[in-house]
Every structure is written in structure tokens, then in C-alpha cells.
Amino acid sequence: MAQTLVEKIFSKASGKEVKAGEFVMANIDLAMIHDITAPLAIKAFREILGSDAKVWDKSKVIMAFDHQVPADSVHAAENHKMLRKFAEEQGILNYDVKGGIAHQIMVENHVEPGMLIVGADSHTCMYGALGAFATGIGSTDMGFVLAMGKLWFKVPESIRFNVHGKLEKHVYGKDIVLKLIGMVGADGANYKACIYSGEVVEKLGMSDRLTMCNMAIEMGGKAGIVEPDKTTLEYLKAMGRPYEGELLKSDEDAEFQEVELDVTGMEPQVAAPHRVDNVVGISEVEGTRVDQVFIGSCTNGRYEDLKIAAEILKGEKVASNVRLIVIPASHREYRRALKEGLIEIFVDAGALVEAPCCGPCMGGSFGLIASGEVSVSTSNRNFIGRQGSPEGKIYLVNPAVAAATAIYGEITDPRKIK
């Protein structure tokens, strides 16, 4: 029976051969919890097994603090205190405030091809860039996973996005995925695994692949996946954990829904307020005055993203009307950017460089916008109130557009900068 990669992963996890549409109880390889969703998950876990219960496998549970870091309220501080105690009692790995954004920590240190992974956060789908099936679940479901190490799933159908052509300068994975979201809509891939394929994707580095998989949820996807290849293995080796196991891949005659995209001549894409699928070419919004620019998040806070922005900002100054916030996605990414002089470039330009965390992306910690203000952000969502006032506006862009915009104080096409 011909199978997609997704069907193969669920077959392995459930111990039987399965097809899309079947309901299965599957064993979980890794579970991720963070400071916002973990408290409710722990509450559910204790309701299932009791206050003295132990998680099913302490080696498979990873905790990190990233949303409210450093603690921005007494409530957040108390949550952190409770979570530290839970992690210590359970013997689970807790990165605390020292690792960065949970999703970036996971791909750097834990995710392997072929794994079935759940996280109590919707952008867990990012891990699929390494050939895993990773999906976000609610805190109650996570409580069950912590207790039992398994969860029921409907095996998703797969939609394959075949990306062809040649990318223009300053057009990246962010632009590809925004274009695809605009094409199919916010519910165009509901409960489907979004498989990114084609010669353009094959040539993309891991950072761009992570960006694309991260945003699969923005078109309703259950997961975002790039089938594992040489780039996957090179990334894992660079992270200090070379992979020599089996590389599961889709059979050639497996069934997919197919979507084609030719990126030849495509300009940088922008998700305009207030929907991620409200996607336009940058030429339609050029000149829009901006108050804040955010370069970071699990979507675009990696070294490669920071380098793109730094190359544009080098020797320049942030416009007088703009606040530029830069946040590396992890401490590993921060150290590399620091070593190679990128942080100095940002500081010299007038940016606020913050410690690795979610920052303005989730709108609950710092870097919020006021009513009537406009934010240009490399993050993944632009819903009303996402970064502060519900009367503010958010435009989602790639790092080059963000950097150019910070310099000129209005949405700017980086291809026009000399």
C-alpha cells in the first residue's frame, strides 16, 4: 500500500499500517510545554492521575519559559515558580528562561525525522521542517499525554505544495508561505498536513524551511512538513547530533492534493491587517507609515534572518518615528549573532535588542503598540490586538522588508535600496 510520509509516521506510532482518515491511538515521541500552557496541562494531568503522579516518561517531556520572560507580573512569577517545582519533582528537562523560544529549542536539541511530536502551542508544526510530524494540542490533551504518553488522532490527508521557479532578491521562505496562505485561505488546509516540495524548497536552507512549516497552521494545517533530505542531515550534524536512522519518505505513488506555485518574478509578500491570508505584494502597501518594527519570533528570529536584516541596517539609523525591536529566537542564535557582529550593528542603528523570548509576538509582555499605531513584524499572526491595542495594525513581512522599513519609517521594498 502506497503511503505518504504522514501515514508512515502514524503507522510507526500506532503499530499498524494506517491510511488518511483512520482514527488511531498513537504513541508520542516528544511533548513540549511552556510557561503559558503548562499550568493548565499540569492541572489536567493531576486530575487524571492524582497530585503525586509521575509523567509517563520524563525523558520525553521538555519545558521552556518563553512567553512571559523575564516574568512581567507577580502572576507570571508565581507560574514560573510552580513550573520549576513541577519540573524538579518530575525530573523533566526544563530550559527555564535560559534557552529561548521553545520551538527553536526543540529543533536545535530534540527533534528528529520520523518522530510524532505534540506541543501545547499552535506553532509546534514548525518541527516538521526536520521531517517529523509535529502538531499543537490543547492543555487538556497535553495533560492526558503527560499521563499516558499517547493520544488519539485522525490521520490527516496531505496537501503537497509544489514550489517552482526562481526567487527574486530579498524574497524568502516567508514570502513563499505567505503567498500560499493567500492562495488557499486561512482554512484552505484544515486538518491537512502541508507538505512543501519542488525544486525551490529543495534549495532552501533550514531556516527558511522552519519559517514555512511554522506558518502551516495559518492556513489551517495540522502540520507543516519538508520531507527529510541532505539539508536535514546537515542541519542535525551542525546542531551536534548527527542522525543515522531511517529517513521515512512518501512513496512515489502516494495520494496527495496538489497545489502549484511558480515564484518567478514574485515580489516580497505582505500579510495586511487583520488576517494572515490578507496577502498582497509589497507594491500595494509601500509607503504605509510605521511606528514599530519587530524582527524576531519563532518564525524569523534565527541567525539567517538576523543576518539578512543586519546587512541592510549596517551603517544606517532607525527612522526617528520608529521603534525597532530585535529578538533572537534562542541563546544559540543570539551567541552566533553576537560573535559575528550582528548585535553591534543593530545597537548602532538604534534598535532595542532583547533576550531570546516571544516578545511582542504574543502581545502580553513588552513591545506593545498603542491605538492607531502600525507594527511591521516578522512574526506569524496579525490578528486584531495581537501585539497590543485592538485599534493598532500589524503587517507581516520578511526580515529584509522589516529592516528596510525601520530605516525609512514606512513600508519599503528592500530591492529598491542601493
From Swiss-Prot:
Residue numbers binding [4Fe-4S] cluster: C298, C358, C361
Pfam families hit by this protein: Aconitase
Cofactor list: [4Fe-4S] cluster
One annotated GO biological process: L-leucine biosynthetic process
Keywords: 4Fe-4S, Amino-acid biosynthesis, Branched-chain amino acid biosynthesis, Iron, Iron-sulfur, Leucine biosynthesis, Lyase, Metal-binding
Subunit and interaction comment: Heterodimer of LeuC and LeuD.
Function: Catalyzes the isomerization between 2-isopropylmalate and 3-isopropylmalate, via the formation of 2-isopropylmaleate.
HAMAP family noted in UniProt: LeuC_type2
Protein name, UniProt field: 3-isopropylmalate dehydratase large subunit 1
Originating organism: Archaeoglobus fulgidus (strain ATCC 49558 / DSM 4304 / JCM 9628 / NBRC 100126 / VC-16)
